[in-house]
UniProtKB/Swiss-Prot annotation:
GO terms for biological process: isopentenyl diphosphate biosynthetic process, methylerythritol 4-phosphate pathway; terpenoid biosynthetic process. The lineage of its organism: Bacteria, Bacillati, Bacillota, Bacilli, Lactobacillales. ATP binds at P94, V95, A96, A97, G98, L99, A100, G101, G102, S103, S104. The active site is at K10, D136. This is 4-diphosphocytidyl-2-C-methyl-D-erythritol kinase. Keywords: ATP-binding, Isoprene biosynthesis, Kinase, Nucleotide-binding, Transferase. Belongs to the GHMP kinase family. IspE subfamily. Pathway: Isoprenoid biosynthesis; isopentenyl diphosphate biosynthesis via DXP pathway; isopentenyl diphosphate from 1-deoxy-D-xylulose 5-phosphate: step 3/6. It is an enzyme of class 2 (transferase).
């Protein structure tokens, strides 16, 4: 038996950092949305009790560093499963891009194995397992548009964000999330209006949404990587309704109500960066 699971990318429409917690993590508020750029995972049972991860990406590890491997291993140990599995990851989401590609692959692995092995786990149980691997995994299991707080692990579903076209651009740099958080001074950050953004989304107000998107981490990443600001400026020059860095970066996205504008931005950035994608939101 072979099954296939999609693993959609996600963007941060809003991200605020409130303070550093006593446990060393930062208290955050964020609004996520799934987009139709996705990896695909194919699952196949093996007779030998091994975990085999394969992929078409040369940038992706296939050992214990891979979130998919970790998901399989955790399920096998937690539920005393003695079965072998081969998972092939068809990679379409850029690696280390701030689009939760690894977390979404992990979520797809948990969903797929729950079906393939007839585990009968509820969504809450899958989220509990996923949270042990990464804080974005519970969101990626549910997908859609959602509000997150705490360390990012507390998820509340929202209505699907107003439909629009999205241009994703990943520059040829890597950004360390831990470095960004270590560099930030919470008192000096620009704090976006997450409450206003949430209201706009709940009301289906596209204009209100574009006016309230914001990312408190942008200034920190831009200080180290000015190309992020250059991409934003180009997007706005070509007619984006809004442009924002996703997560800790380096990917930047543009929101466009009209496909013609999105296509213009796509064409204008294609020569500036290699990895440019024209996508839509997912429900």
């Amino acid at each position: 038996m072979e099954i296939i699971e999609r693993a959609p990318a996600k963007i941060n429409l809003g991200l605020d950092v409130l303070h550093k917690r006593v446990d060393g993590y930062h208290e955050v508020e964020s609004i996520f949305a799934s987009v139709d750029l996705a990896d695909h995972l194919t699952f196949e049972n093996l007779e030998e009790d091994i975990i085999r991860i394969e992929t078409d990406s040369s940038f992706l590890p296939v050992d214990r560093r891979n979130h998919v491997y970790q998901a399989v291993d955790l399920l096998k140990r937690t539920y005393n499963i003695h079965k072998g599995i081969k998972i092939y990851i068809e990679k379409r989401i850029p690696v280390a891009a701030g689009l939760a590609g690894g977390s979404s692959d992990c979520a797809a692995a948990l969903r797929g194995l729950n079906k393939l092995w007839n585990l009968g786990l509820t969504m809450d149980e899958l989220c509990e397992i996923g949270s042990q691997i990464g804080m974005d995994v519970p969101y990626c299991l549910r997908g859609g548009t959602a509000f997150a707080n705490g360390r990012g692990e507390k998820i509340e579903a929202l209505p699907t964000m107003p439909q629009c076209w999205i241009v994703l651009v990943k520059p040829r740099i890597s950004v360390s999330t831990s470095t960004v958080f270590n560099d930030l001074a919470v008192d000096e950050l620009h704090h976006p209006d997450i409450a206003g953004l949430r209201i706009a989304i709940e009301n289906g107000d596209y204009t209100g949404m574009t006016q309230t998107v914001g990312n408190a981490l942008e200034s920190v990443t831009i200080a180290r990587h000015p190309i992020v600001q250059q991409i934003k400026d180009r997007m706005l020059k070509y007619g984006a309704d809004a442009a924002l860095m996703s997560g800790s970066g380096p990917t930047v996205f543009a929101l466009c109500e009209k496909k013609t504008r999105a296509q213009r931005i796509y064409n204008g950035l294609k020569g500036f960066c290699e990895e440019v994608y024209l996508v839509r939101t997912l429900k």
